[in-house]
């Protein structure tokens, strides 16, 4: 444990001098992996080969819902080759997450580039009293999931400066901010783009076994909210009782070239007025969408022909437009008042730059879309699901153990493959239908996957923002290395992992709803029940 803080920024010993051979091996293995796009391309080639073998062997199953005989189909059949080549553009454009991400990013790009996200994050951190700094920063980190990479660029360095000004070690600020942004990425207070993305991948996977099944974008809200509530005191305890005592108090100054006022990002009068107008626009947008649901006699976003939560299906479907409108309107209002958006041409340029930033995702989506489509054409998804469900049913494992196993699998993969959507695109067509046949809802399966996927984000050098956070730490302590970073963040990963396992186990055991209109359990149609009990 360090008893005295560094005398000045950039000096002093690293957090931990120990270097583990296992870390070097993981780093070498991770660096040897290709880009996620090539991983998906490889998965497609493997899928084609498996489909050929399965079709030749006559591998199949009986759909327990419809009674239909499912037969594996070779992807090298003439029909599938023609379908692949003719429908290639439609395969990409029909990929559900692509439209969701592009639509929301049109608005989010304006909110980010106008400075709205930075002003909101900065303004929230600067006003925090020192005793409540740790939990407040963690909660702001949860909210900042909507700001994407802006949270790493703005909140983490800003929090380090705020902690240093308060006489606390700046790396403590880095640790709690990074834990909130990335370590607790599965949790959130308000659903956002990532919910749309992940549940958008889940929907077609669920429809492999139940074509009528619908997944709404809020399907994980109660679970992600519970993560935020549970992880906040845990992160507070780990920070104040483990991380900070080890680092000690800070007696140094600010890094070279950083003035205190500039470092803390003091808002100008125009920026403060911009935040006020952004708040007004947010209130208007929320009011309009609420009126479209709650209008007397039934609003346009309420389906009066349905009963219960299904009445809100049009509202759930409109959330993509709601997020886009909210980000666009608030960002435009803030930028127009603060001076970052001078004309409508500036607005259009920001939206275009947002599309440029998601270009790598479009490339990934092309291969993910074709993997999902080819999986469906081969019939391997439902065949694997039915046979896998039969095998698991024979083992008679409890549902909590099944979901904890999925959590562990996604955690292990996260050490090597950073893209949550790429991994879920490959896993969902198998695990979602399989667990549906065992009574677990697609939303609960997605929630368990997301929990596991976020635990090791903060300790794997392969995470996309890990190098950025490491550089921020090195501004304060020059010899701070990868091992130091692992040692700094590992207590959070261990604590979050244990808490996550407990939460998933309790949630599915109590059959709590995962989100609005999204139960933790799945009740198959009568046909599947009959197939399990046999004829009377």
Task: Enumerate the predicted regions with their spans.
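Intrinsically disordered, low-complexity non-transmembrane regions of multi-pass membrane transporters
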Residues: 1-32, 61-76, 244-273, 520-536
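Interfacial loop/helix-cap signal at membrane boundaries in integral membrane proteins
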Residues: 17, 21, 60-95, 208-216, ...
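Membrane-core helix-loop-helix motifs of multi-pass transport proteins
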Residues: 27, 31, 156, 160-251, ...
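Core transmembrane alpha-helical segments of multi-pass membrane transporters/permeases
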Residues: 36-45, 49, 70-118, 312-382
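Hydrophobic core segments of alpha-helical transmembrane domains in multi-pass membrane transport
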Residues: 40-55, 101-109, 140-142, 180-184, ...
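Interfacial/capping segments of alpha-helical transmembrane domains
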Residues: 52-81, 194-198, 297-307, 378-387, ...
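Membrane-interfacial loop-to-helix junctions in multi-pass transporters
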Residues: 79-80, 90-98, 125-136, 170-172, ...
């Amino acid at each position: 444990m360090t008893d005295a803080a560094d005398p000045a920024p950039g000096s002093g010993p690293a957090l931990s001098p120990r270097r583990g051979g296992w870390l070097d091996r993981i780093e070498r293995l991770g660096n040897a992996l290709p880009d996620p796009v090539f991983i998906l391309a490889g998965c497609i080639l493997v899928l084609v080969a498996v489909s050929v073998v399965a079709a030749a062997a006559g591998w199949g199953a009986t759909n327990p819902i419809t009674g239909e005989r499912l037969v594996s189909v070779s992807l090298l059949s003439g029909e599938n080759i023609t379908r692949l080549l003719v429908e290639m553009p439609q395969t990409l454009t029909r990929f559900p997450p692509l439209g969701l991400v592009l639509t929301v990013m049109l608005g989010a790009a304006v909110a980010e580039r106008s400075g709205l996200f930075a002003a909101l994050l900065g303004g929230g951190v600067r006003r925090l009293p020192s005793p409540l700094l740790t939990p407040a920063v963690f909660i702001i980190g949860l909210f900042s999931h909507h700001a994407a990479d802006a949270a790493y660029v703005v909140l983490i360095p800003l929090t380090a400066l705020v902690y240093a000004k308060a006489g606390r070690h700046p790396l403590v600020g880095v640790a709690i901010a990074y834990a909130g942004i990335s370590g607790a990425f599965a949790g959130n207070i308000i659903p956002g783009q990532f919910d749309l993305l992940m549940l958008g991948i889940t929907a077609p996977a669920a429809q492999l076994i139940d074509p009528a099944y619908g997944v709404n974008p809020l399907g994980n809200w109660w679970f992600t909210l519970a993560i935020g509530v549970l992880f906040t005191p845990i992160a507070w305890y780990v920070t104040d009782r483990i991380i900070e005592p080890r680092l000690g108090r800070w007696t140094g100054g600010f890094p070279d070239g950083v003035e205190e006022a500039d470092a803390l990002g003091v808002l100008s009068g125009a920026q403060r007025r911009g935040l006020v107008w952004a708040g007004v626009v947010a209130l208007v947008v929320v009011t309009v969408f609420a009126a479209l649901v709650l209008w007397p006699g039934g609003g346009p976003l309420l389906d009066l022909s349905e009963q219960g939560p299904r009445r809100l299906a049009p509202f759930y479907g409109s959330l993509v437009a709601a997020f886009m409108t909210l980000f666009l309107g608030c960002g435009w209002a803030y930028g127009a008042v603060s001076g970052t958006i001078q004309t409508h041409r500036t607005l259009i340029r920001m939206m275009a730059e947002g599309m440029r930033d998601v270009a790598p995702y479009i490339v990934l989506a092309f291969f993910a879309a074709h993997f999902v489509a080819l999986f469906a054409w081969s019939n391997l998804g439902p065949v694997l699901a039915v046979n896998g469900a039969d095998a698991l049913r024979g083992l008679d494992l409890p549902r909590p153990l099944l979901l904890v196993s999925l959590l562990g699998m996604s955690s292990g993969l996260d050490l090597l493959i950073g893209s949550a959507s790429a991994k879920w695109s490959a896993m969902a067509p198998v695990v979602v239908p399989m667990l549906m046949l065992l009574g677990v809802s697609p939303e609960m399966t997605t929630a368990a996957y997301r929990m596991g996927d976020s635990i090791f984000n903060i300790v794997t050098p392969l995470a996309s923002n890990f190098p950025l956070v490491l550089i921020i730490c090195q501004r304060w302590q020059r010899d701070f290395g990868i091992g130091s970073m692992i040692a700094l963040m590992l207590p959070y990963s261990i604590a979050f992992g244990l808490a996550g396992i407990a939460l998933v186990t309790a949630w599915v055991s109590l059959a709590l709803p995962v989100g609005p209109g999204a139960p933790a359990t799945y009740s198959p149609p009568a046909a599947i029940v009959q197939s399990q009990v046999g004829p009377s």
